[in-house]
Amino acid sequence: MADTTGRIPLWIIGTVTGIIVIGLIGIFFYGSYSGLGSSL
């Protein structure tokens, strides 16, 4: 964890990836419950 200079820390990548994945899953379930996901 010492040489994070010039590179993005791993926990930031994990946090951003987790937020994106949760957001996509939330949008997918919201669309399917709204009837928009049935056409996909």
UniProtKB/Swiss-Prot annotation:
Pfam families: PsbJ (PF01788). GO terms for cellular component: chloroplast thylakoid membrane; photosystem II reaction center. It is found in: Plastid, Chloroplast thylakoid membrane. The chain crosses the membrane at residues 8-28. It is a single-pass membrane protein. Keywords: Chloroplast, Membrane, Photosynthesis, Photosystem II, Plastid, Reaction center, Thylakoid, Transmembrane, Transmembrane helix. It comes from the Eukaryota. InterPro entries: PSII_PsbJ, PSII_PsbJ_sf. Gene3D superfamilies: 6.10.250.2070. GO terms for biological process: photosynthesis. PSII is composed of 1 copy each of membrane proteins PsbA, PsbB, PsbC, PsbD, PsbE, PsbF, PsbH, PsbI, PsbJ, PsbK, PsbL, PsbM, PsbT, PsbX, PsbY, PsbZ, Psb30/Ycf12, at least 3 peripheral proteins of the oxygen-evolving complex and a large number of cofactors. It forms dimeric complexes. Belongs to the PsbJ family. One of the components of the core complex of photosystem II (PSII). PSII is a light-driven water:plastoquinone oxidoreductase that uses light energy to abstract electrons from H(2)O, generating O(2) and a proton gradient subsequently used for ATP formation. It consists of a core antenna complex that captures photons, and an electron transfer chain that converts photonic excitation into a charge separation. NCBIfam families: PRK02565.1. PANTHER family: PHOTOSYSTEM II REACTION CENTER PROTEIN J. This is Photosystem II reaction center protein J. It comes from Morus indica (Mulberry).
